[in-house]
């Protein structure tokens, strides 16, 4: 019975096949007729080379992300010692052996490879190992891996946000999403994505709780979605709706191939609650924690030194920024500019501040859009366009009445939409002591609505092609 042994991956850094390849190259460069030597049969094929019985583990390289079957330098030394002991000749260590820096830090399963069949079987596990490591690197916010994912121009990035009740953290009050299909856009010659035109987005309010359950400690703003019309959805149908959005963007599940979908989150709390809601995510989907990614960028000095928008003090290492405060750091003069860091022009800074002020936080739709937009700014701030926001015209009140046959409606109502109920802002309430507001009284010099009750609700200037 074979024994199961775990070893520390530190020191296991020499690709086994590269050891054999390096020796064949060394013999050729130095004109060594190895095939005429008494020990030459050890190098006649890779299978003969494996007969030495090599101790190996599988790891992934921390820089390239590729998976390798690696051995230790001491094992190479033992092979050279065996040749000298048996055949009386000293074979030097070959140069140019591929060295790997293991990404894994936990113990690995030690295996003994003695023939090509064992090596081939172990080699077949490398794609799954590489995928598992890549998912871990992206989830941890490793900048190199995340930048590679973005530069592939073939993934779909989906940002989601939930607003939960403060009284019952299992009650979802709102859900919003924003997505960009990079592969689709790149095939149309559109790169980088233009947030205002290329983001697919939506905002849903749970009908059972609308205007009934309201958070007090962290006030939410369900009626102030800035990028379109909100929709009312029942509590029982929300998981089905979310599942349909994910299914429309994801590729098939696989143990060896990464999914085309990358889910953006800000922390991992919502993912756990999605499981409780019965929402299944394919195992090969990548999860990118934007907060961890930004913290890593700041820790390594890529973002320079800055003021924390929350405290107005120099930012401390390890601190986490909310999506809107993350965007504010792009609109503030940095305390120190890092090498290669892009700083927005004053005009773009003013445009970004206007966008942030027009999109109230703790609205699930706004937060999802800002999460995706802030992540794109971290990845490509120099070429990312800032969305232009203008006040949204007031619409009809929410209607939850069931759809009726068109023939049974009066002629004056045949133009009504039969789609899902749209939740635009309720009519503005007039104060008991105030006079009727004229339209010009509702617009300030900065083109924003006065904050009267829930009536302030900015919207997007123009719609475009979704990615």
Residue ranges and their predicted role:
Residues 2-115, 187, 195-200, 205-214, ...:
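Metal-dependent phosphoesterase core characteristic of DEDDh/y 3'-5' exonuclease domains
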Residues 150-160, 164-257, 263:
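Glycine- and small hydrophobic-enriched segments that form the cores of compact globular domains
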Residues 23, 46, 79, 83, ...:
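Generic structural signal of hydrophobic/aromatic residues within well-ordered alpha-helices
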Residues 413-467:
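Extreme C-terminal disordered tails of eukaryotic proteins encode short linear targeting/docking signals used
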């Amino acid at each position: 019975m074979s024994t199961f042994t775990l070893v520390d991956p530190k020191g296991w850094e020499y690709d086994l096949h590269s050891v054999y390849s390096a020796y064949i190259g060394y013999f050729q460069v130095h004109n060594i007729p190895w095939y005429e030597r008494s020990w030459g049969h050890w190098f006649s094929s890779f299978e003969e080379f494996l007969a030495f019985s090599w101790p190996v583990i599988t790891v992934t390289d921390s820089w390239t992300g590729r998976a390798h079957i690696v051995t230790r330098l001491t094992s190479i030394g033992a092979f050279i010692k065996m040749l000298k002991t048996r055949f009386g000749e000293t074979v030097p260590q070959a140069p140019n052996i591929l060295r790997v820096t293991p990404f894994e830090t936990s113990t690995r399963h030690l295996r003994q490879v003695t023939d090509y069949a064992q090596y081939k079987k172990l080699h077949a596990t490398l794609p799954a190992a590489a995928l598992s490591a890549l998912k871990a690197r992206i989830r941890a916010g490793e900048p190199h891996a995340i930048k590679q994912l973005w530069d592939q121009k073939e993934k779909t990035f989906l940002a989601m946000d939930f607003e939960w009740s403060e009284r019952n953290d299992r009650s979802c009050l709102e859900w919003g999403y924003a997505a960009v299909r990079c592969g689709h856009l790149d095939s149309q010659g559109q790169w980088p994505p233009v947030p205002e035109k290329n983001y697919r987005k939506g905002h849903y309010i749970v009908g059972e709780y609308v205007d009934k359950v309201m958070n007090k400690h962290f006030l939410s703003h369900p009626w102030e979605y800035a990028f379109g019309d909100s929709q009312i959805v029942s509590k029982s149908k929300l998981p089905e709706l979310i599942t349909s959005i994910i299914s429309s963007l994801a590729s098939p599940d696989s143990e060896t191939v990464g999914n085309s979908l990358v889910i953006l989150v800000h922390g991992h709390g919502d993912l756990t609650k999605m499981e409780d809601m019965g929402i299944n995510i394919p195992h090969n989907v990548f999860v990118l924690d934007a907060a961890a990614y930004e913290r890593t960028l700041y820790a390594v000095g890529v973002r320079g030194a800055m003021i924390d928008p929350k405290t107005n003090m120099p930012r401390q290492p390890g601190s986490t920024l909310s999506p809107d405060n993350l965007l504010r750091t792009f609109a503030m003069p940095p305390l120190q500019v890092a090498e290669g860091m892009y700083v927005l022009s004053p005009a773009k800074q003013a445009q970004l501040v206007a966008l942030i002020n027009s999109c109230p936080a703790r609205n699930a739709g706004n937060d999802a859009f800002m999460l995706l937009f802030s992540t794109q700014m971290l990845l490509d701030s120099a070429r990312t366009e800032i969305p232009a926001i203008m006040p949204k015209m007031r619409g009809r009140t929410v209607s939850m009445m069931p759809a009726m046959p068109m023939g049974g409606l009066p002629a004056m109502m045949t133009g009504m939409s039969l789609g899902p109920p749209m939740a635009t802002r309720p009519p503005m309430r007039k104060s008991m002591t105030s006079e009727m507001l004229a339209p010009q009284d509702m617009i300030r010099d900065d083109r924003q609505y006065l904050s009267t009750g829930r009536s302030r609700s900015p919207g997007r200037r123009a719609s475009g092609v979704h990615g």
